[in-house]
């Protein structure tokens, strides 16, 4: 089989692209993460039946160990006090926060978190590379339930603060407008009024 000279560059380009794709696959440099969704596995069941699992607004005390898929540890709280977080306040990566929902005190879970729910394209240099899948082993040590009023205050207080700023600016503007449009009395009239008042006395 002979190739026409005009198709030779096209075949060479196709061969080059194919070999580059094979080399990249063999080197393990795939651009897409092998894990696309959050995977949560219970390692240790809670010691007693759990009446009230963790929910948004609750304060959790957790011990955790975070690692890459290859086993390299990126962070752990086992050598220090438990981490204290409030669910729903985005204090930890999204995948870890999602894995803590409905957890009970004494329960241990393993969460395998895809990069878009972890550190994303930037990573967390130097310990977490870009687009890395991470694994967290988490134990819930204590749970402080948020009461209804506390949730209400935390939900409404920022809105009230945001509404107060325009209201105060409006009041200040109104006061300045009234002050600027008040009829001005000349100094002569003020002196005359003062004299007239003193004469009447």
From Swiss-Prot:
Keywords: Isomerase, Membrane, Rotamase, Signal, Transmembrane, Transmembrane helix
Function description: PPIases accelerate the folding of proteins during protein synthesis.
Catalytic activity of the protein: [protein]-peptidylproline (omega=180) = [protein]-peptidylproline (omega=0)
Gene: FKBP11
Subcellular location: Membrane
One GO term of the biological process aspect: chaperone-mediated protein folding
Name this protein carries in UniProt: Peptidyl-prolyl cis-trans isomerase FKBP11
Organism: Homo sapiens
Subunit description: Interacts with IFITM5.
One Gene Ontology MF term: peptidyl-prolyl cis-trans isomerase activity
Lineage, uppermost ranks: Eukaryota, Metazoa, Chordata, Craniata, Vertebrata
